[in-house]
């Protein structure tokens, strides 16, 4: 930190012209950062709604594949991560590879949505949206992609719904054996052990007796929490900006990523109940099944082609936490891969774009139907 401040002072006391340019850029970033944001420039149309959710459609540059690629977004984030920069956009990349792309945008959830839970998404919203997508794309089947919490959503949807219309399933950075997820996994395991010593408290927590208004978390807390979970990445990003104030591209990228991280959306209380107290604390998916209310969902019901990915440097959901999914389904076509980057970088980093996006394209190409107009 001291080194970074020293370098900054050296820059700001350098040649007058250079100094003026750097001070101007620093001022733009601090006071007019919104004007520097580059995200969500790829054109799309809305082809359907489900309550506050929207189905975005991004047409292929030249359609090569019958099955569309459907991105299901995690809750709490805005959609920028899928279309971050004009020159490095996940959505734009796959439309250029010949896929019609659809994105499930959950909209701006708020306190009034505090009762929403996993089943509202995997048993209601996602099935409805997939029916709309199948009709719009004129394809019986789809390729379904989920990252982070959305990876859990698409996994449980595919296991629960029959028929599910999923030809190819992609699950990235999603905790399957939560206790194996580094330090945070050990913490959840320890908390679960402590709770098991007091049956009354355990029942209150695990059976939904805590009011959803208490469990509901506003977007600003989610934004702070995301940064706390990766303080090194947050610090390094600011340090690189301060050391390279004359780099116009870096200035735009810092503002764009900052805009994404600073504008998170609420987590409904019911979803926090299912994610924190079920997925993370009880770790049911390690055994291949989860109980949500009166429904037991078994991963062995999944038999489609399955690609599982984990970030090489992901400290939130480690590779050891993700990989067990490889052994829990009835798919005869399972691929596990490590992706450059951490929990966010596996979706958006330059290394992921250079290495993983082409690999995913090839994987889908080998498992998709050629489109005939």
Region locations from a protein language model:
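Alpha/beta-hydrolase-fold enzymes
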Residues: 1-12, 135, 139, 154-267
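Gly/Ala-rich beta-loop-alpha elbow adjacent to hydrolase catalytic centers
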Residues: 145-154
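Short, surface-exposed "cap/lid" segments of acyl-processing enzymes
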Residues: 42-110
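Alpha/beta-hydrolase active-site loop
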Residues: 116-134
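Catalytic histidine-centered segment of alpha/beta-hydrolase-like enzymes
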Residues: 316, 341-355
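Short beta-strand/loop motif that positions the catalytic acidic residue
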Residues: 302, 308-310, 314
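Short alpha-helix in the alpha/beta-hydrolase fold that links the catalytic acid
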Residues: 304, 318-327
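Short beta-strand immediately N-terminal to the catalytic nucleophile in serine-hydrolase-like folds
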Residues: 144-146, 172, 309
